[in-house]
Amino acid sequence: MHMKLILNLLVLLAPAAVFAAGGGHGDGHIPTSTIMFQAINLTILFAAIIYFTKDAIVSFFAGRKAAYLEAAQKSAFAREQAEKEFVDIKNKLANLDQTREENLRKAQTHAEDLKKQILEEANDVTKRIKNDAELTARLEVQRAQKELRTQLLQDSVEAARIVLTKDLGSSDQQKLQKDFINNVGV
């Protein structure tokens, strides 16, 4: 790298040294030999610049080309992905519009079925509660009637005992015993 730099500087500064050595002023004619030497020096300069920098220039532009191609590929891939996503979203929107009515109908049907099921369960629970209440009421009435009968019998027996012990004489007792023996058959 240093060698190329030194050589480039020498090629650039050599014409300056040549012109400095000339020192004289020419007459009014066109110095074709001077122009010729300058053209040759300029050609040598450009040839040297091209010779020593062509690898760097070629690699620079090759790198730029590779970077550009890579960016173009990424851009093309991103565009393809975006187009695919666009088509996918467009299809989903079209499908959503088509299935919206069907989904609403299904939801309404499901809601109606659920409503019917809840009403049926509520009716079943209501009937069960009503039947249980009626059964409980009947059982309570029967129990109350039984208790009343038992109480009535106990009160009747007690009243009969009191009446029999106070008002019953020995002739009445003998008559009752005969009736008891005849009815029971002992």
Curated annotation (Swiss-Prot):
The lineage of its organism: Bacteria, Pseudomonadati, Bdellovibrionota, Bdellovibrionia, Bdellovibrionales. Pfam families: ATP-synt_B. It comes from the Bacteria. The keyword Endoplasmic reticulum does not apply. This is ATP synthase subunit b. PANTHER family: ATP SYNTHASE SUBUNIT B, CHLOROPLASTIC. It comes from Bdellovibrio bacteriovorus (strain ATCC 15356 / DSM 50701 / NCIMB 9529 / HD100). Its main location: membrane. Belongs to the ATPase B chain family. The chain crosses the membrane at residues 5-25. Keywords: ATP synthesis, Cell inner membrane, Cell membrane, CF(0), Hydrogen ion transport, Ion transport, Membrane, Transmembrane, Transmembrane helix, Transport. HAMAP family: ATP_synth_b_bprime. F(1)F(0) ATP synthase produces ATP from ADP in the presence of a proton or sodium gradient. F-type ATPases consist of two structural domains, F(1) containing the extramembraneous catalytic core and F(0) containing the membrane proton channel, linked together by a central stalk and a peripheral stalk. During catalysis, ATP synthesis in the catalytic domain of F(1) is coupled via a rotary mechanism of the central stalk subunits to proton translocation. F-type ATPases have 2 components, F(1) - the catalytic core - and F(0) - the membrane proton channel. F(1) has five subunits: alpha(3), beta(3), gamma(1), delta(1), epsilon(1). F(0) has three main subunits: a(1), b(2) and c(10-14). The alpha and beta chains form an alternating ring which encloses part of the gamma chain. F(1) is attached to F(0) by a central stalk formed by the gamma and epsilon chains, while a peripheral stalk is formed by the delta and b chains. It is a single-pass membrane protein. The gene is atpF. GO terms for cellular component: plasma membrane; proton-transporting ATP synthase complex. GO terms for molecular function: proton-transporting ATP synthase activity, rotational mechanism. It is found in: Cell inner membrane.
